[in-house]
Amino acid sequence: MKSTKELRTVAVRVPPRTTGAERRSAKAVLEVAAVCAGTGMALIVASDGAAGWRLARVAGVVTVVLGVLSLSRRRSITGLAVAGALFGLVVAPAGGAIGFPSLSRTGWSLRAGGGVLAALAGLVLLAVGTTLAARAVPGWRRLLGVPAALLGAYVVGMPVAVAVFATNVARTPLGSETPADRGLAFADASFVTSDGVTLSGWYVPSTNRAGVVVAHGASSTRSTVLDQAAVLARHGYGVLLFDARGLGRSGGRGMNLGWYGDEDMAAAVGYLEGRPDVDPGRIGAVGMSMGGEEAIGAMGADPRLQAVVAEGATGRGIGDLAWLDEAYGIRGRIQQQVSRLTYAMADLLTDARPPASLRSSVAAGAPRPVLLIAAGRVDEERLAGEFIREADPARVELWVVPGAAHTDALRAEPEAWEARVTGFLDANLRPAR
């Protein structure tokens, strides 16, 4: 016979079990929460964009919900619990990051209500699903739940959060400075994109018949590129600074991955093309970070852009991250997969379509030249720049600025920046003979 102590030990090792009634109740909760979460996400993804694309995104959400619900037919609740927890891990941060800010800014709307519903239902899925899944794991193995939860948060939660914040950008107000603070005469400018968004900017007239679009980075405005614009204006270039859509005084919805860049840049080039002081065959672009990526993308799609300077450009899609594998090995491959989920989620949350990779845009822009500027203190910029340059080393120049931070090359090396950038533009925006 076993001793009392041995019996107690055995009893401790028996995992708690759910009764049939508890199992049915838990299944019902998970099913209702999954439907509510799916409804909320459907309201979010159907809130903007072309009708066909809205329908496709809603169909994707419905497919996921049906997949989760299909697991409720099984006798074991574990599969449903795990699927529910994973679904909750996605929709809770996505719904919360969209719903509550929308509610505070604009009050109740389909988008705000959908976000709040998805967030609350996602939390229920996450809590109930995780609890039930943990009950199915015996003894010490439950301790593995902590690192598993952290891994899940990194692999799923973080990409979702990044995608949500990239596609739901708070409007950044225009700064108080204008070109006049740099001693430049200017005029207000506005122009409309091909999809009907009005963009706002400043224009400094040209004295050398060439024009340059100057594009800012994510979550900022034209005010942040005044220093770069002033350098170009001193050399006679007409300079158009504009707020990307959804930022500053421009209309539309912001997108920090730069996926609307082709449309925005095309409209900006069109504005310069129509200026009487600008030769339409002498138009270039200088972009910082997201603006640099947009300028490269625009060159691949718009033959009117004759030369591009891109500082701090690394990528805006999964095709731009192929260098991670070679540079960082297994860590790079993991980062690629995490980023793949980020871009997939972003694609679900916005009407903007994923753009061509920077490398393919450079190839499509041949034979027009590109100058890439990378921060010496940011290894990823150099590595990404080398990867982009491989598309056509003969016409893509990479300048790594020692000691410079992200988009800080002008401050770190003002004389060198002025000489390199204006020299590049002078050489490639010359009058046609």
What is each PLM-predicted segment?
Residues 4, 35-62, 142-192:
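An N-terminal hydrophobic leader/cap segment in hydrolases
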Residues 170, 298-351, 361-363, 368-369, ...:
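Hydrolase active-site cap/lid region
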Residues 191, 200-202, 220, 345-425, ...:
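Serine-hydrolase catalytic core
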Residues 209-217:
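Short beta-strand element of the alpha/beta-hydrolase
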Residues 218-231, 244, 251, 383:
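The serine-hydrolase catalytic nucleophile loop
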